[in-house]
């Protein structure tokens, strides 16, 4: 009797695995139906919750008729040209003045000219960085580390830039 129960359980388990991973061709996509996740629409893969290269309008369900203008929202990922994969933090928009001021201030700091307002006197003549001002945004670090200005960050540029940053801003 034990062998018959084990054979029945094995048959049920293998049957459910086959039903899950080998569905009918025109069945609704479920787990294991690879073509649903890898089919291409035009020249890019389907993305959930991201805008396409042409831009789309965002309609809020609680919005009134007069509020249905085109709402643009820039997310973490900025869309590349012609529907390509998004690149992190490299949008083609014009940089604002605040961003340029912050960038130039941090570039001066990394080149050796430290700002005194970011440092605090310990009382014994030594100085330390304020805890809230120890981070620099990644876009500014990318521009600062890219020494040959080709728009690509090589391993050597990253290592030398990181060494310069650690000398200017110790982590303790």
UniProtKB/Swiss-Prot annotation:
GO MF annotation terms: calcium ion binding
Induction behaviour: In isolated central nervous system neurons, up-regulated or down-regulated in the cerebral, parietal, pleural and pedal ganglia in response to different stimuli. Up-regulated in response to noxious input such as injury, as well as by the application of neurotransmitters and second messengers such as serotonin that are known to be involved in withdrawal behavior. Also up-regulated by thapsigargin which increases the intracellular free calcium concentration. Down-regulated by a decrease in synaptic activity in the nervous system induced by increased Mg(2+) concentration.
Organism classification: Eukaryota, Metazoa, Spiralia, Lophotrochozoa, Mollusca
Protein name: HCS2 neuropeptides
Ranges for domain EF-hand: 133-168
Modification type Valine amide: residues: 88
A Gene Ontology cellular-component term: axonal growth cone
Residues bound to Ca(2+): 146, 148, 150, 152, 157
InterPro entries registered for this protein in UniProt: EF-hand-dom_pair, EF_Hand_1_Ca_BS, EF_hand_dom
Residues found modified as Leucine amide: 31
Keywords for the protein's UniProt record, in alphabetical order: Amidation, Calcium, Cleavage on pair of basic residues, Cytoplasm, Cytoplasmic vesicle, Endoplasmic reticulum, Metal-binding, Neuropeptide, Signal
Compartment(s): Cytoplasm; Cytoplasmic vesicle, Secretory vesicle; Perikaryon; Endoplasmic reticulum
Gene: HCS2
Task of the protein: Neurotransmitter or neuromodulator peptides that mediate withdrawal behavior such as pneumostome activity in the respiratory system. Possibly regulates calcium levels in command premotor interneurons.
Organism: Helix lucorum
Residues annotated as signal peptide: 1-19
Gene Ontology biological process terms, A to Z: neuropeptide signaling pathway
Tissue: Expressed in regions of the central nervous system that are known to control withdrawal behavior. Detected in the cell bodies and processes of the command interneurons (at protein level). Predominately expressed in the LPa3/RPa3 and LW/RPa2 giant interneurons that are located in the parietal ganglia, as well as in other unidentified neurons in the pedal, pleural and cerebral ganglia.
Isoleucine amide PTM positions: 48
């Amino acid at each position: 009797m034990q062998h018959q129960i084990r054979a029945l359980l094995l048959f049920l388990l293998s049957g459910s695995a086959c039903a899950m991973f080998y569905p009918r061709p025109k069945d609704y996509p479920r787990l294991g139906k690879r073509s649903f996740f890898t089919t291409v629409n035009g020249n890019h893969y389907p993305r959930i919750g991201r805008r396409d290269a042409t831009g789309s309008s965002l309609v809020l369900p609680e919005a009134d008729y007069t509020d249905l203008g085109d709402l643009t929202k820039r997310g973490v990922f900025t869309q590349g040209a012609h529907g390509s994969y998004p690149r992190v933090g490299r949008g083609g928009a014009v940089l604002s003045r605040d961003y340029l001021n912050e960038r130039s201030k941090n570039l001066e700091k990394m080149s050796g000219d430290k700002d005194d307002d970011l440092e605090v006197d310990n009382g014994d003549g030594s100085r330390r960085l304020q805890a809230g001002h120890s981070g620099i945004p990644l876009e500014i670090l990318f521009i600062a580390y890219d020494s040959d200005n080709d728009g690509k960050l090589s391993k050597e540029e990253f290592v030398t830039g990181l060494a310069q940053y650690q000398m200017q801003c110790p982590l303790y």
